[in-house]
Each structure stands twice: as structure tokens, then as C-alpha cells.
Amino acid sequence: MSNKDIRVVVGMSGGVDSSVTAYLLKEQGYDVIGIFMKNWDDTDENGVCTATEDYNDVIAVCNQIGIPYYAVNFEEQYWDKVFTYFLDEYKKGRTPNPDVMCNKEIKFKAFLEHALKLGADYVATGHYARIRRHDDGHVEMLRGVDNNKDQTYFLNQLSQEQLSKVMFPIGDIEKSEVRRIAEEQNLATAKKKDSTGICFIGERNFKEFLSHYLPAQSGEMLTLNGKKMGQHSGLMYYTIGQRHGLGIGGDGDPWFVVGKNLNDNVLYVEQGFHHDALYSDYLIASDYSFVNPSEIDLEKGFECTAKFRYRQKDTKVYVQRENENSIRVTFAEPVRAITPGQAVVFYNQEVCLGGATIDDVYKNEGQLSYVV
């Protein structure tokens, strides 16, 4: 089958990465369709309206490269699967990662299903990751060539079934090369700056945004020994290891968030970047997913490396089953500021094995006061 007989539906955001993705596939002779996903009703807020502007950029790029385009509305699915999860996690005192859930439920589920109905053989996105396809049909997900842009951390929940239908055309090139191609082809998005922040918040003030949906309750800010250091403005606004916004003056080392007590509405703080309370030996995680589950033996356990946040250096870990729903991840050496609600993502060199959601963090068999 030649490329012209293979239909690839590209998820286009109005950014340079997805624009170049569509361009490269068209150049390679595929039957390409561009789709703009509308996941958030920006008329809900008084924030900056970017969706219309982004869709106009998609239209401009698709017209330039000569492919058809559509807009598809996934607002309902996004609210049900991503945004309610996001709010529920904050209510529990955790720090969620909505990008992971968005990839799992929207971009590679709702969007993939929609694309297949359009006769797609594959979907493609502008993620910095790679797919390795084997002769027996199974696939592996590899880190993007541009180490600084690698996005496998956010794709850790994708299954074998999902990844077998996915292409990541820019995963093999550096971001600078993506920009160069866009400028060389004079694409409408060539000079557009990369978006930052959570997809549905955009450039808005996070604290203000969250306050629209969750009532904040101020409370005491204490050291672990009970010394009062001030007031916090709502536990949901703080994350483990946070330094800024505490309002603690005085001399000496800066202060950091080391824990939360939801029942008493207390925020725990301690002084010093390397304070003992910020370090842990192992964690318990749930909602684990592996790209090739048949190759993973949780009963026996296995060694690999892991990331606990995006762009963090890999840490050597040992992974084993804790119980029916959870895994235990033990670190080769103590790790600082691991945060419940975030993803732990596993790697074997350049291969991303999968990931899980961090629930509890321990030191010397004792649970840290991260969320009590």
C-alpha cells in the first residue's frame, strides 16, 4: 500500500508543532486531514479567548499545505473525563496532571475514535515522542529525539491499542528544526510562540481560575513541630516543595511546603531546600498502565528508571506489586518533593514503559505528611 492510500488524521492545535506535523505527512504523500479539537468553552470565563484565533491559524496552515480541515467539539467529554478529575484531585489536596488525562481520554480516545469514523488508518499529533513498530505487530513508545522537549511523560497512560494507530512525525527531529521547517515553508504559525500552562486555563492566573470552581478556605501555616508561621490562602493553591507565595519573611534559608493536613486545614512548612521532610524512599501508585503489559512482571518486580515530574532527570527505581490495585516504587536513593496526584513514568533507556498516578509517599516505612 502506497502512502497516498493511507489516511492520517492530524490533531491540529494552531501551534507550530502540529502545523509541521501535517506538512511533513503531506510531503510524504499521505492522505492527510486536519482536525481542530475544541475542548473548552472559552465563553465560560472572562479570560483570553484563544480558540477562535487558534482555529483560524489551523485554517490558514491547512489551506497553505492543501489539506481539508474540520473542527470537532469535545467539550462535553473533556468536562466529564478531564476537568471533573482535575477538580476532584484538588479537593483531595493533591496536584493533578490534566495533560496526562487529556491525552488518555481526549486526544487518543475521543479524537482517535472520531478519526477512525472518518476512515483514518492513523492519527498524528505534534508530540515529541517516537513509535517503534515491530514485525509481530506490537509497538513501543520511545522518547523524542529532542531531550528537552520529550513528551512521553504526558503520554504514559497510552495503551498498545492506542499507540498502534498513532504517528509522531516530529519525534525524530529537534524543536529548532521544526521551527526552521515552518519558517522555510512560510507556514502561518512559524513565529507563533509555544503555549504554556494547562490547556483549559491558558495564560490566565491559576489561583483566580481555580477559585471560580472550588471555594478556598484559609488556615494555619505550621512547622511540623507546631510553630505557627502564618496563614495559607487555601490548601489547593500549594504543592509539595513550593517556595514562592508563602509570605514568610526573616533571615536564613527559604521556606518550603512539606505537607498538608486536609482534616485540620493545615499547611506544613519547613526551612531549607534540603530539609529532611522533603525526601522520601518509596511511593505507592495506582491507575498504572504499561505499553506492553505482557513484558512486565509485577509479582517478581523489575528495575528501571523513572521520572516523577516533567523534564526531571531519571532516577533508578525498583517496581513491584503492592496489592491488587497499586504498585510500590522504591528509589535507589532518596528523592525530593514527590507530589501525590502527579505521574510517575517508567523508562528502560529510551523506551517509555508506562506510568501510574502517585498516591502516597513514604520514608523509613512511615507515610509523609503530604496529604493527611
Swiss-Prot record:
Disulfide bonds join C102-C199. SUPFAM superfamilies: Adenine nucleotide alpha hydrolases-like. Pfam families: tRNA_Me_trans, tRNA_Me_trans_C, tRNA_Me_trans_M. Its main location: cytoplasm. The active site is at C102 (nucleophile), C199 (cysteine persulfide intermediate). The keyword RNA-binding applies. It comes from the Bacteria. GO terms for molecular function: ATP binding; tRNA binding; tRNA-uridine 2-sulfurtransferase activity. The record marks H127, Q342 as: Interaction with tRNA. This is tRNA-specific 2-thiouridylase MnmA. It comes from Staphylococcus epidermidis (strain ATCC 35984 / DSM 28319 / BCRC 17069 / CCUG 31568 / BM 3577 / RP62A).
